[in-house]
Amino acid sequence: MAVDKGRRPVPPERRAQGRKRAEPGDVTIRETRTRPVHTPEPEPELLAKDGILELEDDDDNDDDDDDDDDDKSNHHDGAPKNEDDMEAFPELVSGKDKDDDGDEDEEEDDEDEDEDASDDEAFDSDDLENWDEEADAKYGDADLSDDDDVKEGDAALERMIARARVKPDESERTTNKLGIDTGVAARFYDESRNDDGSKRGRVVQSHVTGMPKVEYPPIEPEYDSDSSTEDVPNRIGQVPLSWYDDLPHIGYDINGRRVLRPAQGDELDKFLDSVEGEGDGWFSAHDKTSGQDVKLTDEELDIIQRLERAQIPVEAYDPYEPATDWFTQHQQTTPLTARPEPKRRFVPSKWEHKKIMKIVRAIRQGRIVAHAPGRERPAFYNLWSDADEARADHPMHMPAPKLPLPSHVESYNPPAEYLFGDDEKAEWEAAEPEDRKLPFLPAKYAALRLVPGYDQALHERFQRCLDLYMAPRMRRKRLDIDDPDQLLPKLPAPRDLRPFPTHTDVVYAHAPWRIRTVSIDPSGAWLLTGPDDGHVRLWDAALGRCVATWDMNAGVARADRSPVYCVQWCPNRTFGIAAAVSVGRVTLLAPPQCGKTMYEASLAHLTTPHAAEDAATAQWTRASEADRAAGVCVRIDVRNNKHASLVPKYVRWHARGDYFATVSPEAAGEAVLIHQVSKHRSQAPFRRTRRAGNSAMAVQCVCFHPSRPWLFVATQRYVRVYDLVQQSLVKTLQPGVRWISSLDVHPSGDHVIIGSYDRRVLWFDLDLSERPYKALRYHSRAVRAVAYHPRFPLFASAADDGTVHVYHGTVYSDLLQNALLVPLKILRGHAVQDALGVLSIAWHPTLPWLVSAGADGDARLWTP
């Protein structure tokens, strides 16, 4: 057996001690060991021929660390159990590998020689056989002590390096219930359980997928159950517990049994609870509902500790979480579409210009002030000053209308007069639902508990919802006026405006014929009436005696006879002439009863001129000597272009008495004709007065201006003012009514009064507006006639309700002051026949007298 020269053999124990590497954190334990004494066995059985026994350095091969660990454990446990364990440590090198590893062995030998030159000495195999263990004991102990010092230094160095390499723990310090750090405190539960006492899961292989999975233990009621679903024994609700201060119980459970008050300990018991046991007294809170001390959980204690440290109660919440810009962190360089940019992207916006100009105008007007000082606020103010103020509603907020309050008929025990009889019940059932006054049948019950359910409740609630959703709402401003009389204008008393007609003085009877028209001559002594029998009657106005009668249908077939539609005296006092229209012609009368001088002047004025030969619209004819002696002077036959007779129904004189106009509503271009008495000539000033198929343009009446050459033409809905000299339209009055019935012009010429079939009387101020100045709605039926008094500030209106309304109307010369209109008197005396009342009225030319003609066949003179 060859042994490497220059090396000192080391016993197996020293070899094992030298190859052992100290681990970081290990604590070296020195102990005295007894070296085992044994008889060496023959070497040829262990080593091959020419084998070499080499001890490698600890730093040469890192793969031997695992073996070192095993030897280390054996070293600490004591002496090796057998010799095989001791001798298995060295590496056995065979002779055939010597050549291959020669260079490596030489390098290792050189290193070993340099390190152990002072310690190792060469000896041969005979020395190994004659090894003296006792002699080498002292030397071995000294060598072991040196090795222990080296290992202690290496272990300290390794610990320093390990501490330098470990990343510092930046997590917050956690403590248990007693305030001790959980890193150094003893665990209450073993490793198989979590800190809260629940069992930990274990990783097992799935039988289905074959993959590892976490298998959790079954839930234990003591640790894993949730107490949030447990029933609370005390079921008193949110009531003050002070109610039970003087009672032995603190409430009732779900079964209605009393929950007795638990025994309460004194201060000594509380102190003992906090000292003895596990210290649960420090982690308990008193529950007022149950009267017991409830132990707080770890989560609740953690929340309390976080609140004490002014931290967020939720541990998982991160207030400083880095914000991730999901939409703009990656710039998109590829466009979605290749469409060219529109022109509006390069042209200034028109709407932005308007908005900017709006702001500029506000700045110029001073509504927007740049750098305006803010409103000064007081340094000290009442914090709760506006706490009780109601919040302002939205500007467009309109509250829903409230439902009507229930009445006696909706009672379950209504009075007998509210109950329906058999006939009323049958009528209610036969009527449509929208025509019924009540949506239900009133019923009577002896007690409220006997009232059945209302079957229409859901339907009524649905209709209410429809009304709130579909019906538009309107806001009406209400005036906060204590005295309603403040709304009425300050008008003078009627007694201060006398004289005006108040009662009937004379009655002119025409029974059974209704009187369509009435007129008083300029002197006021004579009265003309036109009833339906076709005769014009002359009356003495003061006495009420009929003086003369003229038949307007003389020479006309019985089938063509017609009533007298209108009669009008000439306003010229020089002549006593009257015009009456009926059966398609106009008759000029000169009553001889008016006086011989006036009769002769009137007759000469009517019969001297000659009629025009080329008259196409009207034919003037002188009456016979007998007719002229009776008072009939001239007849005018009104014809159209086809020589068909027309029916004029209205006549009106000019203020000078030489012209008068007639109206035929059914005619077209010749509805209005102007006749000149001095020349016996008639003409149509309008070529077309009604459009084809438009009855609203039909002429109803006309009137001359008292001082200007103006003609007022009233159609169904409008009043047009024409200048006859300039042949132009001056203005159009817009009454806003459906059908105009009558028209009259004030003696001053600046005001117009209009009556309509929709029960309204309208006053117009021509200098003020084309709209009505006043609208009087005092009649209950259609207005038939209106008239101004020639001298007094009076005007009147007659309607089908059988009444005549007298008004006071003062017109001021000052244009800045409006007219004063005052209702004075309602004259009642005419009876309504066939829905017709008073058909015509006329004022006395010099006295405050009024004559009215009605459908009852009477004409009445009203005086003060």
Curated annotation (Swiss-Prot):
Keyword annotations: Nucleus, Repeat, Ribosome biogenesis, rRNA processing, WD repeat
Gene: ERB1
GO BP: any one term: maturation of 5.8S rRNA from tricistronic rRNA transcript (SSU-rRNA, 5.8S rRNA, LSU-rRNA)
Subunit structure: Component of the NOP7 complex, composed of ERB1, NOP7 and YTM1. The complex is held together by ERB1, which interacts with NOP7 via its N-terminal domain and with YTM1 via a high-affinity interaction between the seven-bladed beta-propeller domains of the 2 proteins. The NOP7 complex associates with the 66S pre-ribosome.
Family stated for the protein in its record: Belongs to the WD repeat BOP1/ERB1 family.
Pfam families noted in UniProt: BOP1NT, WD40
Residue ranges with Basic and acidic residues bias: 1-52, 72-83
Compositionally biased intervals (Acidic residues): 53-71, 100-135
Cellular component terms per the entry's GO annotation: nucleoplasm; PeBoW complex; preribosome, large subunit precursor
Main location per the UniProt record: nucleus
Record GO terms (molecular function): ribonucleoprotein complex binding
InterPro entries cross-referenced by the UniProt entry: BOP1/Erb1, BOP1_N_dom, WD40/YVTN_repeat-like_dom_sf, WD40_repeat_dom_sf, WD40_rpt
PROSITE patterns: WD_REPEATS_1 (PS00678), WD_REPEATS_2 (PS50082), WD_REPEATS_REGION (PS50294)
Segments of this protein annotated with the region Disordered: 1-153, 191-231
UniProt name for this protein: Ribosome biogenesis protein ERB1
Residue spans of the WD repeats: 509-549, 559-599, 694-732, 735-774, 778-817, 833-864
Job description of the protein: Component of the NOP7 complex, which is required for maturation of the 25S and 5.8S ribosomal RNAs and formation of the 60S ribosome.
Signal peptide (residue range): none
